[in-house]
Amino acid sequence: YKVAINIMQIPELSFREIRNTVMIIKKTRADILYFADSMGSLDALKTKKIIHQIKSLWSKSTGIHTHDNMGKALENSIEAINNSVNWIDCTVTGMGRGPGNTKTEYLILELKRKKEHLINLFNLIKNYFEPLKEKYKWGSNPFYYYAGLNSIHPTFVQEMLSDSRF
């Protein structure tokens, strides 16, 4: 097995805090250093800067977990791939808490650009994931976008949306 450590809410950290955190993690026996855009507020440029900072201190595998509050999860995942991040999280239809994650099907399209290999995946999405998405209401919306802009945790949005006053 492999052990990964995930730095959560990385956009909220200064570069000094990121450096200090990586230095602490280096003292462990972790195999992979992950970072998460927990609020879905990163853009490609900041993603690239964070990756370069981590890689300047960490020689083992790296990973990224993106959220799609502002519709940038795919863009940030591609940026991570272009900057040699080894592990890229994605989920079918972006399934995940709140606004969701990088969509597997979009990532495959961007990486392969071979639509004929996606028929089975698209059937899976249509028949199974879209009904689940409708039932459990994941995916981005203006509330999650606003939350991403203002560093508001997705839990607050979920609680607000489930409250009959809103």
Model-assigned labels for residue ranges:
Residues Y1-F166:
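Catalytic cores and adjacent flexible loops of soluble metabolic enzymes
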